[in-house]
């Protein structure tokens, strides 16, 4: 949903944001009242945009697996939301945006024509996008980087990371550098931060012993051999960058890292 925030600046109209969880209260009727107030404000300030974050908090399906108990506060709130959206005509100057990571549980009535007409899937950023996001957070924090830091390389190591993950990665790298009293954040700090995000924190007090270490070493070596063979046989496939048999807080006894 962070992808929607730039809309506030680009649209140059009032941007009214809220979280759907704010509508749900102990007292029945409060949620519906807040929805009415929200839409009344948007109409008064039209042209305007309403942004409802985590809309699944009040808009779960009323049928089947995700059924809402009848007369529940959430159902009244959802009904009011549907009523307000039906009240818009084609010339309405109010646009409603909703964000959720659980589109599968939303009530079908929410997706009917005249309500939420369009669905936009926001995927995790690609390598170019990740590099741009890293640049933003490094610049925003005025982070002093070492000469060996190449954000394009860091972006290649972070496949599948969201914008929030990348922001946390920059913070983690800065913390790791700070703990060692460094005056700049070096590439190794980013690498360790990536490893922590992917595999967890090293358990330095829980090292593998004897046959267990041998089994894990063979297992990870097998991953590395296959990964290396694939990278040589198929053009464009990444090579194995690192192996580890240090236990991690994520219950992994080791890992083989291959960036995309």
From Swiss-Prot:
EC identifiers of the protein: 3.4.24.-
Broad enzyme group: hydrolase
Topology versus the membrane: Single-pass membrane protein
Cofactor: Zn(2+)
Residues reported in the UniProt entry to bind Zn(2+): 219, 223
Compartment(s): Plastid, Chloroplast thylakoid membrane
Main location: plastid
Gene Ontology annotations for the cellular component aspect, listed alphabetically: chloroplast thylakoid membrane
Pfam families in the record: AAA (PF00004), AAA_lid_3 (PF17862), Peptidase_M41 (PF01434)
SUPFAM superfamilies attached to this UniProt entry: FtsH protease domain-like (SSF140990), P-loop containing nucleoside triphosphate hydrolases (SSF52540)
GO biological process, one term: proteolysis
UniProt GO molecular function: ATP binding; ATP hydrolysis activity; ATP-dependent peptidase activity; metal ion binding; metalloendopeptidase activity
Family membership: In the N-terminal section; belongs to the AAA ATPase family.
Identification of the protein by name: ATP-dependent zinc metalloprotease FTSH, chloroplastic
């Amino acid at each position: 949903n962070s992808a929607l925030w730039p809309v506030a600046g680009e649209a140059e109209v009032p941007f009214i944001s809220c979280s759907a969880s704010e509508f749900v209260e102990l007292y029945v009727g409060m949620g519906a009242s807040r929805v009415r107030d929200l839409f009344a404000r948007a109409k008064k300030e039209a042209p305007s945009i309403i942004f409802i974050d985590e809309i699944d908090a009040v808009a779960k399906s009323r049928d089947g697996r995700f059924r809402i108990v009848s007369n529940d506060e959430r159902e009244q709130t959802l009904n009011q939301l549907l009523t307000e959206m039906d009240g818009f005509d084609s010339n309405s100057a109010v646009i409603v945006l909703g964000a959720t990571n659980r589109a599968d549980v939303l009530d079908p009535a929410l997706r009917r024509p005249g309500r939420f007409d369009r669905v936009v899937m926001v995927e995790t950023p690609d390598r170019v996008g990740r590099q741009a996001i890293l640049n933003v957070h490094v610049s925003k924090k005025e982070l002093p980087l070492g000469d060996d830091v190449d954000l394009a390389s860091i972006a290649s190591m972070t496949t599948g990371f969201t914008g929030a993950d990348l922001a946390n990665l920059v913070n983690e790298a800065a913390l790791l550098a700070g703990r060692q009293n460094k005056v700049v954040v070096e590439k190794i700090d980013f690498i360790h931060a990536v490893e922590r995000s992917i595999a967890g924190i090293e358990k330095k007090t829980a090292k593998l012993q004897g046959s267990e270490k041998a089994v894990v070493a063979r297992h990870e070596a097998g991953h590395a051999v296959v990964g290396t063979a694939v990278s040589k046989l198929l053009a464009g496939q990444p090579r194995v960058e690192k192996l580890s048999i240090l236990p991690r807080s994520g219950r992994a006894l080791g890992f083989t890292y291959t960036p995309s």
